[in-house]
A protein has these predicted regions:
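Glycosyltransferase donor-binding loop in the core domain
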Residues: 18, 40-43, 115, 149, ...
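Conserved acidic donor-binding segment of nucleotide-sugar-dependent glycosyltransferases
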Residues: 148-155, 163-168
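Glycine-rich phosphate-binding loop at the start of an alpha helix
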Residues: 45, 97, 117, 145, ...
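Short acidic/histidine- and often glycine-rich active-site loop of Leloir-type glycosyltransferases
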Residues: 134-145, 149-150
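Short hydrophobic beta-strand element within catalytic cores of glycosyltransferases
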Residues: 119-122, 129-133, 149
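Conserved catalytic-core segment of nucleotide-activated headgroup transferases in glycan assembly
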Residues: 4-8, 12-102
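C-terminal amphipathic helix plus adjacent low-complexity
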Residues: 170-224
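Acidic donor-binding loop of glycosyltransferase active sites
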Residues: 92, 98-115, 126-129
Length: 224
């Protein structure tokens, strides 16, 4: 979008970065799933309410003993009201590793919003596979069935979640690929290499060459 509005500028994206602790707990000892995100951000409120009202009822008969953890600062009243024995509104957690080390998967049922979603690359960095909407993965270079599962309609989302929850082969593939993709795109090393390239003499010289009668200007766009 920025490039379309500013065709004579060289716009490069330096994404948000995450630590990559990886996973040392196998599929067999994991259970439950989570959503993580701050609730000052309206898309997160909508996503949780959408999941709880439209998707969660489709899961109860298949995953009766599983719990859904909602993690995030300042959950509003409508989110807090979702709490039951199996829906845990955990609020702000200073240390999220115990959750990521125990759950089988993470959900990102976002229906609007923009930018690289930290909830997704953070989950993948812990080796926790994600089920997400197509909106949630925009701009993240993730492939359905390889790095993540993508579904938009409630029935399809529920079906993908159940399959991932029950299939060790699928879970292991997405867990391993997710760690690899996060390391390649969202690690400190990936950001360092991108910045080294952008400020290299070779790249800066290329910006001096005119294109269609105008000179390029380097613009860095950071995502969060």
């Amino acid at each position: 979008m920025l490039q379309e509005k500013q065709p004579n500028k060289s716009i490069q994206v330096v994404s948000n970065i995450v630590d990559i602790p990886g996973s040392n707990r196998p599929f067999a000892v994991r259970r439950d799933w989570l959503f993580i995100g701050g609730f000052q951000h309206r898309p997160n409120i909508d996503a949780v309410l959408f999941f709880a009202k439209e998707i969660y009822p489709l899961l109860s008969e298949h995953l009766r003993d599983a719990k859904f953890y909602i993690i995030g600062d300042k959950p509003p009243a409508e989110v807090a009201a979702l709490a039951t024995e199996r829906i845990v509104v955990a609020g702000l957690q200073r240390d999220v590793r115990p959750f990521f080390d125990s759950v089988k998967l993470s959900v990102a049922p976002l229906r609007f919003g923009a930018g690289v979603k930290g909830k997704i690359n953070q989950s993948m960095a812990f080796g926790v596979p994600v089920v997400a909407t197509s909106m949630a993965i925009e701009g993240m270079e993730l492939k359905d069935q390889e790095d993540i599962l993508v579904a938009d309609e409630p029935e399809a989302f529920a079906s993908a979640l159940i399959e991932l929850y029950q299939s060790e082969e699928l879970w292991t593939r997405l867990s391993e690929n997710g760690i690899g993709k996060t390391r390649a795109l969202y690690s400190t090393e990936a950001a360092r290499k991108k910045l080294e390239f952008l400020f290299s003499d070779e790249h800066l010289r290329s910006l001096e060459r005119p294109l269609s009668g105008a000179e390029h200007e380097l613009v860095l766009a950071a995502t969060s």
